[in-house]
From Swiss-Prot:
UniProt name for this protein: Nicotinate phosphoribosyltransferase
E.C. designation(s): 6.3.4.21
Family, as annotated: Belongs to the NAPRTase family.
Protein source organism: Brucella anthropi (strain ATCC 49188 / DSM 6882 / CCUG 24695 / JCM 21032 / LMG 3331 / NBRC 15819 / NCTC 12168 / Alc 37)
Post-translational modification remark: Transiently phosphorylated on a His residue during the reaction cycle. Phosphorylation strongly increases the affinity for substrates and increases the rate of nicotinate D-ribonucleotide production. Dephosphorylation regenerates the low-affinity form of the enzyme, leading to product release.
Reported function: Catalyzes the synthesis of beta-nicotinate D-ribonucleotide from nicotinate and 5-phospho-D-ribose 1-phosphate at the expense of ATP.
C-alpha cells in the first residue's frame, strides 16, 4: 500500500470536497454480517438510528460546519459497492468459511444505497436521524460516526500550518509506537483494530493498522474495517452488536417475548453463521439478567464479549458462570473491547493469563489518541463519546441498559420499565470518556 504524508494531506485544502467515506466497505464487518441476517429475517421491520453525543460539554454544532456535514453525508449516499468489492465479498473466506454471504444477499447488496437522513441543530448539538427499513438504516451507523469525528478533527486542525501538523503527527506516531512496543512484551497476545467509528481520520486508522501489522506481527489478528481488511490482506473481524436484541425487545408483544429477545437473537445468529462466530454479547439489558435467564445451550458457545463492565470484573463474572454450567474456562474465549488502552490491556491480560482464552478489540484509544500531541493543547483533538444507536423499531421505542448506567439509551420511561423488568443488579457507574 502506498504511503501517504498525512500532515501534507491535511494541510492541502485545494479540493472542494475531500470525501471522508469513499467506499461502503469502509464500515465494521459485523454490520455486513448483521445486515445479511436482517435482510433475511426482518425485511419488513423499520428502524430509526439516532446520533447520541454522550460528551455533552462538546457542542458539535458549534465545532462542525453544517454545510460540510451535509456535503459529506450527501457524498456517502452516492456510493455503491464496486465490482471489485462484490467479487471480494463473494470469493473471500471469513472466519474459515467460504461464501459466508449468500448469492441472493449479494445480488441485493449490489444496488444498495444509504437512505436519506434528517439533520437539524438544537442547543449547540446536531440531531441526526435515519428513518426507514432496518436493512437500510443500520448501514448509516458507522459512516455517520466516522464522518462527524473526522470533521471535528479537521476543524480542530484547520489553523495549523505545515510545521505544526508535522509535529502533531510525529508525536502521535511516536505515542502509538510506544504502545506497540509495550504490547510486544505480552506473549501470546491476540489483538485487533476496532477503531473505525471514532477514528481521527481514515488515513490515520490505516497508519495505525499498518503499525500494528509491522510492530506485533501475528499478535495482530485483523481489523473490523472491511475496506482496510481487503486493502491490507488482513482478516475482517466482528460478530454482532446491541441493535439486534434492542430491536427484538422493542418488537416484543408480551413479557415472555421481551425476556427471550436476547436468546432469540442468538438462535437466529446460529442459524446463519455458527462456528467461530458464536460470540455472545450479554450486556444489552444487563449481563446479570442475561446470565440469570440464559438457556443451557448458551454455555456451549465459543465465548463472550463483556462490553460495558470493567474488564476484570466482567470477565470474572462470566468465568464463574461458565464454571456453574460445568464448562472449563480455559477452553472458552473472552473478547474485551470497552474503552481499552495499553494500560487496561496489560492489566487484563496479566490477570486472566492461563485461565481463559483472550482477545482484545482496540478501538478509540488506538485510532484517536492525540492528547498532548499538538504544539499547543487543542480541545477538539480529544476523542469524545459519540454513538449512533437504534432508537425505535416499527414505532416502538428501543432501549439499551448496559452494565454501565452512563451508557443507557432510550426514552427515560422505557429505560425505567426495562430496569424494573430485567433488574438493576451488578450495574456499575463508570465515567464514559470514549
Amino acid at each position: 500500500m502506498a504511503k501517504t504524508d498525512i500532515a501534507r494531506r491535511v494541510y492541502n485544502h485545494a479540493w472542494k470536497l475531500d470525501p471522508i467515506v469513499r467506499s461502503l466497505l469502509d464500515t465494521d464487518f459485523y454490520k455486513l454480517l448483521m445486515l445479511q441476517m436482517i435482510w433475511g429475517l426482518y425485511p419488513k421491520v423499520d428502524a430509526t438510528f439516532s446520533l447520541i453525543n454522550r460528551t455533552t460539554s462538546v457542542r458539535l454544532a458549534d465545532e462542525i460546519d453544517e454545510g460540510e456535514l451535509r456535503a459529506q453525508l450527501d457524498h456517502a449516499r452516492t456510493l455503491r459497492f464496486s465490482k471489485k468489492e462484490m467479487i471480494w465479498l463473494a470469493g473471500n473466506s471469513f472466519y474459515g468459511r467460504k461464501q459466508i454471504f449468500q448469492p441472493e444477499f449479494l445480488n441485493w447488496l449490489h444496488d444498495f444505497q444509504l437512505p436519506e437522513y434528517d439533520l437539524r441543530r438544537k442547543d449547540g448539538q446536531y440531531e441526526l436521524h435515519f428513518h426507514g427499513p432496518w436493512s437500510h438504516t443500520t448501514m448509516w451507523e458507522i459512516p455517520a460516526l466516522a464522518i462527524i469525528n473526522e470533521l471535528r478533527s479537521r476543524a480542530a486542525m484547520k489553523n495549523l500550518g505545515p510545521f505544526s501538523l508535522d509535529v502533531l503527527y510525529a508525536r502521535a506516531k511516536a505515542k502509538m509506537w510506544s504502545k506497540v512496543e509495550r504490547l510486544r512484551q505480552l506473549p501470546g497476545l491476540k489483538i485487533s483494530d476496532f477503531g473505525t467509528r471514532r477514528r481521527h481520520s481514515f488515513l490515520w486508522q490505516r497508519w495505525c493498522v499498518e503499525a500494528l501489522k509491522e510492530g506485533i506481527g501475528d499478535a495482530f489478528t485483523g481489523t473490523s474495517n472491511v475496506l482496510l481488511a481487503m486493502d491490507t490482506d488482513l482478516e475482517a473481524l466482528g460478530t454482532n452488536a446491541h441493535e439486534l436484541p434492542m430491536v427484538l425487545a422493542a418488537l416484543a408483544k408480551n413479557d415472555e417475548e421481551l425476556r427471550s429477545a436476547p436468546y432469540r437473537v442468538l438462535q437466529d445468529w446460529n442459524r446463519y453463521y455458527g462456528g467461530n462466530l458464536l460470540i455472545v454479547l450479554p450486556d444489552a439489558f444487563g449481563t446479570a439478567a442475561f446470565l440469570r435467564n440464559a438457556p443451557d445451550w448458551v454455555a456451549d458457545w465459543t465465548g463472550f464479549r463483556p462490553d460495558s463492565a470493567p474488564p476484570i470484573e466482567g470477565g470474572e463474572r462470566i468465568i464463574e458462570w461458565w464454571k456453574s454450567r460445568g464448562k472449563d474456562p480455559r477452553e472458552k474465549l473472552l473478547i474485551f473491547s470497552d474503552a481499552l488502552d495499553v494500560d487496561t490491556i496489560e492489566e487484563t491480560y496479566r490477570h486472566f493469563e492461563g485461565r481463559v482464552r483472550m482477545s482484545f478489540g482496540w478501538g478509540t484509544n488506538l485510532t484517536n489518541d492525540f492528547a498532548g500531541c499538538a504544539p499547543k493543547e487543542i480541545e477538539g483533538l480529544n476523542a469524545i463519546s459519540l454513538v449512533c444507536k437504534v432508537t425505535d423499531a416499527n414505532g416502538h421505542p428501543a432501549v439499551k441498559l448496559s452494565d454501565n448506567p452512563q451508557k443507557a439509551t432510550g426514552d427515560p420511561k422505557e429505560v425505567a420499565r426495562y430496569l424494573k423488568f430485567f433488574g438493576n443488579e451488578e450495574r456499575v457507574e463508570q465515567l464514559v470518556r470514549v
